[in-house]
Amino acid sequence: MKGVCKVCGCTMKNPCFSHRYGFCWWNDKEEDLCSHCATAAIRQDPTTIHCVHGLEFPVLTVHQPYALMLVKGFKKIEYRNWKLPKQYVGQRIFIHAGRDLHCTWNKHFSDEMPFVQSVGEAMADELSEMILGSVVFGESQGPFDGIKYGTPYKMYEWPVTDPIRLENPLKFIPGKQRIWKIQF
């Protein structure tokens, strides 16, 4: 029924019903979902993001190859020189692959393993400026002395759980600093 959320039954008159959603995978037709139910569905299965329109989601830009390592589950801790804001602890955050390779990637592999460096550069060319997937970050740990991480700054460790890689990354999206929002 048009104007009624398919999941919870709320209507457009109810304040939680604020968006119309498009052509969706679950039944190959347009459906109405309220913001709350659509957000919950995407947090459960981020691959449904392609069929939702009008919602904002948090995104973190990460240099390659670390962005891909996060969404594939190889990287268990994200290191930042700032604490994860409380409102994002335990929330699904999309991971955006930045345009450039991280400077430490070149420093660590340029002399010892040129092949690994060339693979990393090719990956950065193919998988940059796009949302690759999402993760859930836990409570920040720290601050720790940055010398341990090769930096003069204090560093925080963000534990990573529940990585999900999108089958079809969202391409050609310029990144931003810190956590930013994207609207679908």
Question: Each PLM stretch: what is its role?
Answer:
Residues 27-33, 155:
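Extracellular interaction modules
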Residues 19-21, 34, 85:
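Generic secondary-structure boundary signal with a strong preference for alpha-helix termini
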Residues 30, 40-46:
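Short, intrinsically disordered terminal segments enriched in charged and Pro/Gly residues
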Residues 1-11, 92-97, 101:
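Conserved long hydrophobic alpha-helices within structured protein cores
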Residues 2-28:
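Short recognition patches in nucleic-acid-associated and regulatory proteins
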